[in-house]
Amino acid sequence: MHREGHLDDAYWALRLSLGSTAFLAGLDKFTNLLTNWDKYLAPQVREKLPVSGRKFMYGVGIIEMLVGVGILTRTPKLASYTASAWLLSIAAELALNGDYDIAVRDVNMAIAAYALARSEGERQHASEAEYGEDAGLERVA
């Protein structure tokens, strides 16, 4: 397998794992099967919310599902940058709550999402260089 094949494998591993994790974590905000997500909401944050912590988590879930779908479908670059920023903000909130171990994991996932966004940009650039500006149209025709 050439270098491009290995890079393609890494790209798809990141894309599938980050996209499915974001979607499933978002979906779980409605079921709490994996964990009770409300316990991760820092009291300092909860008291400033205009809605209940539960309703806030529903909103978080919707955003996470949209980001997951974006990574898995037609907007992986934008969705990955969004996931990266989102995960960093979650890590900061977790640190406020003293959940440092989970915050560190979220920082690592944020870095992975950033790497995915960057590699998607490189893939787009390589595709345009190989097929021209109308790369998408030529491949469909």
Task: Label every model-predicted segment.
Residues 1-141:
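Membrane-interface extramembranous regions
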